[in-house]
Structures are given as C-alpha cells and as structure tokens.
Amino acid sequence: MKASELRAKSVDELNGELLELLKAQFSLRMQLATQQLSNTSQIGKVRRDIARVRTLLREKAGQK
C-alpha cells in the first residue's frame, strides 16, 4: 500500500489497517514455519507496510 493512500485515512482507519497487517504477518510467519509459504518476499512487503502505517500514526500523533 502506498503512503499517499494511507495519508488520506483517519487515525482509526490506520489502527484498523495496522491490526490487519499484524494478523497477516503472523499468518505468514506460521506458514513459513510449517513450510507452506512459497513466496517468502510477502513477509518483507507486509513488514514494510506495517512500518509505513506506524510512521504515519506517529506523524499524526505529533501534529496534535
């Protein structure tokens, strides 16, 4: 997900997105552990998306 798309979202929406991404990351890690994950680059993509969302949440918290 692009940062420009995330900037348009509210804090509540970003928190929801963060929760979904953390669940997806957990699921991917479990698939990796059980050798069911074929595309391991997904883990890195989700990790970077989590970082983007957390960065924007931090920016919005600083603006208040």
Curated annotation (Swiss-Prot):
CDD domains: Ribosomal_L29_HIP (cd00427). It comes from the Bacteria. GO terms for molecular function: structural constituent of ribosome. Transmembrane segments: none annotated. Disulfide bonds: none annotated. Pfam families: Ribosomal_L29. One of its GO terms (biological process) is translation. GO terms for cellular component: cytosolic large ribosomal subunit. Keywords: Ribonucleoprotein, Ribosomal protein. InterPro entries: Ribosomal_protein_uL29 (IPR050063), Ribosomal_uL29 (IPR001854), Ribosomal_uL29_CS (IPR018254), Ribosomal_uL29_sf (IPR036049). Belongs to the universal ribosomal protein uL29 family. HAMAP family: Ribosomal_uL29 (MF_00374). NCBIfam families: L29. This is Large ribosomal subunit protein uL29. It comes from Azoarcus sp. (strain BH72).
